[in-house]
Regions:
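Short, solvent-exposed loop/turn segments at the edges of secondary structure
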Residues: 32-34, 39-44, 64, 129-131, ...
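Non-catalytic C-terminal accessory modules of carbohydrate-active enzymes
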Residues: 26, 186-336
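Short Gly/Pro-enriched turn/cap motifs at secondary-structure boundaries
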Residues: 58, 124-126, 260-263
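Active-site core of glycosidic bond-cleaving carbohydrate-active enzymes
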Residues: 1-6, 11-15, 62-239, 243, ...
């Protein structure tokens, strides 16, 4: 939960999540070939593959479906635990999650886009829906799944290197988000420049270029603006896996700067400033009771204050700082 708003969860989000999960549980089947719980026939949006000399789009359990099913089941399960409801339904979700197929790495080194290792019909395709696992979700991360993170990078590199890659405003914004999660500041920044350069107009509106997906002329598409902003935010702050990290993907071109009001998962609003690529001041404001870990380089160099009183953080050997805050608390971190 981003805000920990239990009323919203109970009255709006959980009913929606539950109906989604119920649909999937009814729709998905056990594949007799491998005993995995799968969707299908289904597609990896707008993309296709080659099989036995022909081009197809539909198959059983494309990777994007696995990603979305896991997220829906997991979010729904977490909601039942927070709200203390639907115990038997929660058991069915746990069973379903245990039967989902694992991610697979293709012979080309990338994350498989389909359950089978099919040949890509369009290696230059603009869609990378299977990488929802990397962003915005965190099923693939540098820390938890390093081999899959390496495969995700390979998928990105193969797309970008393909002849006539379909470089649209939103596919380029995706690259910002993907590279931010991989903490590759140089490539993330390059995609920011591409998005704000050839894929934007003077008013900063992003466009889908003529000639891609049948477009006869440039088309304004707002998703480049929103996804681009999200990617830049991800370069400055990450908070998946209950770990908040400041400046996780800071390019050298942004060695001095600041941000205000970025929100971390769980109910934290953050202001921060930095010089020479190092945080010099940060304020974390808790909008809900929260326990989390903070990743901050050279943490022992800082002066820490919780509600204006000196605070001694618990810094572990792995460099993570374990912090507990109540709603309304303010944690200040500053270079003395």
């Amino acid at each position: 939960m981003i805000t920990q708003d239990k009323d919203f969860l109970k009255n709006t989000a959980y009913p929606l999540l539950k109906s989604n999960a119920e649909f999937l549980l009814d729709y998905m089947v056990i594949d007799p070939r491998n005993n995995y719980l799968v969707t299908g026939p289904s597609i990896s949006p707008e993309n296709s593959f080659r099989h036995q000399g022909q081009e197809f789009c539909a198959s059983m359990m494309p990777t994007c479906d696995r990603v979305l099913a896991y997220e829906i089941f997991s979010a729904c399960l977490q909601s039942t635990e927070i709200l203390n409801v639907d115990a038997s339904f929660a058991d069915s979700l746990r069973t379903a999650i245990s039967k989902l197929p694992p991610f697979r790495i293709s012979t080309n080194g990338g994350v498989q886009e389909w359950f089978e290792d099919y040949e890509e019909a369009h290696p230059n395709h603009r869609h990378t829906t299977h990488l929802l696992s990397l962003y915005p979700y965190s099923q693939i991360t540098l820390n938890k799944t390093p081999e899959l993170a390496k495969a995700a990078r390979k998928t990105i590199e193969r797309r970008l290197a393909a002849k006539d890659w379909e470089d649209t405003e939103w596919s380029r914004a995706n690259m910002i988000c993907f590279y931010a999660r991989l903490k590759d500041s140089e490539n993330a920044y390059n995609s920011v420049k591409q998005l704000l350069g050839k894929l934007s107009r003077e008013n900063m509106f992003t466009v889908s270029p003529a000639g891609i997906a049948g477009a006869g002329e440039d088309i304004f598409a707002f998703d480049g603006n929103t996804a681009g902003a999200a990617g830049i935010a991800e370069m400055l702050l990450q908070s998946h896996d209950n770990c908040i990290e400041l400046l996780p993907c800071l390019p050298k071109e942004w060695k001095n700067g600041n941000f205000k009001g970025l929100c971390a998962r769980g109910g934290i609003e953050i202001d921060a400033s930095w010089k020479n690529s190092q945080i010099v001041n940060a304020v974390l404001k808790a909008t809900a009771p929260i326990e989390f870990t903070l990743r901050l380089s050279n943490a022992k160099l800082y002066c820490w204050k919780l509600n204006k009183k000196t605070f001694i953080p618990k810094i572990k050997d792995d460099g993570l700082i374990y912090i507990s805050m109540n709603k309304g608390d303010n944690l200040t971190i500053i270079i003395p």
